[in-house]
């Protein structure tokens, strides 16, 4: 009876105003429909129509995502290049190369994520808050930082990643010295 799949166009059309969908097998759909039949979600029908008229079908969604890829791939390439070349050899951070999505999750040395974000901010680079992927932003290891490269220009991103990598290494060195 699994999986139950959820998706949204929130990041690909209008942030906060996308259309969400759910897919499941017939048995799960019966249970879900029964459980939620008395709730009123008050869908924005005009917004749904906008999305249908814009995308038309799955091929329209795929074509639109290809446009996103043309814009985002060079930005993700910059992020990954800096991580691999500057931070990777030091061992003070790990990350996964995303296969889609809009973020790169970086795990810096335990106990340094907030410091990295602070150092970046002091240098003029604003990041998503440390631990933002955790409930209430509470990362028990203070190690997770989510990089969102979609907004800055390529030149801005190059500079921002240089600063991020220096801040990551500096915070790690300071943490090591604290523990000596």
For the regions a language model picked out, list residue spans one by one.
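Short beta-strand segments
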Residues: 7, 21-23, 97, 103-107, ...
């Amino acid at each position: 009876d699994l999986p139950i799949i959820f998706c949204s166009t929130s990041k690909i059309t209008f942030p906060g105003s996308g259309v969400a969908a759910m897919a499941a097998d017939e048995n799960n759909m019966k249970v879900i429909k029964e459980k939620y039949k008395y709730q009123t979600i008050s869908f924005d029908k005009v917004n749904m129509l906008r999305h249908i008229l814009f995308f038309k079908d799955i091929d329209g969604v795929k074509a639109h995502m290809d446009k996103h890829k043309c814009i985002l791939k060079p930005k993700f390439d910059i992020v990954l290049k800096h991580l691999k070349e500057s931070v990777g050899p030091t061992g003070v951070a790990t990350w996964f190369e995303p296969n889609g999505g809009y973020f790169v999750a970086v795990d810096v040395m335990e106990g340094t994520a907030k410091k990295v974000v602070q150092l970046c901010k002091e240098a003029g680079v604003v990041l998503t808050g440390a631990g933002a992927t955790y409930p209430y932003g509470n990362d028990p290891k203070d190690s997770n930082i989510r990089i969102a490269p979609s907004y800055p220009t390529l030149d801005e991103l190059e500079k921002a990643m240089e600063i991020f990598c220096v801040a990551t290494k500096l915070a790690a060195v300071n943490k090591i010295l604290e523990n000596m």
